[in-house]
Regions:
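N-terminal binding-site loop/beta-alpha segment at the start of enzyme catalytic domains
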Residues: 1-18, 31-38, 42, 51, ...
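Short acidic capping loops at alpha-helix termini that bridge into adjacent secondary structure
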Residues: 9-12, 51-55, 105-106, 130-134
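A short, structured active-site edge motif that brings together acidic residues
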Residues: 10-23, 135-139
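Non-cysteine beta-strand/loop elements that form the S-adenosyl-L-methionine
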Residues: 13-17, 55-58, 162-166
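Active-site mouth loops of central-metabolism enzymes
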Residues: 22-38, 77-86
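Specific alpha-helical transmembrane segments that line the substrate/conduction pathway
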Residues: 30, 58-59
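Beta/alpha (TIM)-barrel catalytic core signal, keyed to glycine-rich beta->alpha loops juxtaposed to Asp/Glu
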Residues: 61-187
């Protein structure tokens, strides 16, 4: 294993994610909770041959998300706010225990909204849980939600953006010009 051979684990930053409802191919799309976190974290630690993860991210909120070009269909009007806040409490409580155990160093979010991010911050503050340090959301010239949705939260709450899809899934690369769709492309 590359990591073990180097013998310099502290010189490397490892980030990984636990995926929830956004991906049906992993744990059948079960929501993120203490059981799915425990399962995913244990497997990640074993697979990566390490005893801790520097940044452990929650990939896709359990309540859904408008990210990855789902903004036209996203409708939060049927969300149960009390259930969502309890869900965030349970997740942060469990992740904070994993931080205390030394298995996780930092907590991050992925494909989260400004409201969701603020709930993580508020609940962490109210309960002395570990704080979210980063958010990994889509960001490109074609997808600027971060600028109008999260930049202010990130600045004032000291949460770093780890952007993904800077070429908008290839749309900005030029390979889809003139209506052409290359074979085996993502779109």
């Amino acid at each position: 294993n590359w990591l073990r051979k180097r013998k310099k684990r502290d010189d490397i930053i490892i980030a990984t994610k636990v995926v929830g409802i956004g991906n049906k191919t992993v744990r059948e799309g079960k929501p993120i909770n203490e059981h799915t976190i425990e399962e995913a974290l244990t497997k990640s630690l074993k697979r990566l041959n390490t005893d801790y993860i520097d940044l452990y991210q929650l990939h896709w909120p359990n309540r859904g998300s408008y990210h990855f070009r789902q903004n036209w269909a996203y409708n939060p009007s049927n969300q149960n706010t009390k259930k969502i806040k309890q869900d965030i409490f349970d997740i942060l409580n469990f992740l904070s225990k994993k931080v205390k155990e030394g298995k996780i160093r930092n907590i991050g979010l992925s494909n989260e909204t400004a409201w969701g991010t603020m709930q993580f911050i508020k609940i962490a503050n109210e309960n002395n849980f570990d704080h979210v340090v980063s958010i990994q959301n889509e960001y490109s010239l074609l997808c600027r939600f971060y600028d109008t949705d999260l930049a202010e939260v990130s600045h004032n709450e000291n949460i770093s953006l780890l952007s993904y899809s800077p070429l908008a899934a290839g749309l900005l690369s030029g390979k889809y010009q003139d209506g052409k769709v290359p074979e085996k492309s993502r779109l």
